[in-house]
């Protein structure tokens, strides 16, 4: 299935849903990108993996969510939680502080086509291509940090 890129301004952020990122073999992965409203250059925090960028943390991982809220009750402070996803830093907390948040569905997962091949050389190359893409965008200052629990 093909997904169309959609951009909008919502909740004080520029959000691009299903951002295409072309890999070295021509396959296009899909990402969601959350940016500050200003036209500056910002550092990027990226997550990448098979956990489906469109799956809410609270809905898709109920037991982990419950344990997190019990252990760290302030998790929701300053957030509506509507953009929270597994392994993604909360855009509502980081974007206002001047970061771009990028969440990429890996090959064959979520909104990205292809066949999942976890921890393979192909997946490593895809991740590399995504990092390089993020570091060279007009809104990026070239610094790309990675976030994840298992990825």
Where are these regions (language model features)?
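N-terminal cap/lid segment of alpha/beta-hydrolase-fold proteins
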Residues: 2-40, 44
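Serine-hydrolase catalytic-loop signature spanning alpha/beta hydrolases and amidase-signature enzymes
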Residues: 40, 50-56, 101, 133
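Short beta-strand element of the alpha/beta-hydrolase
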Residues: 41-50, 145
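Conserved alpha/beta-hydrolase
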Residues: 91-111
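The serine-hydrolase catalytic nucleophile loop
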Residues: 55-67, 79-90, 106
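Alpha/beta-hydrolase fold nucleophile elbow
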Residues: 139-151
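Alpha/beta-hydrolase active-site loop
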Residues: 85-86, 96, 118-138
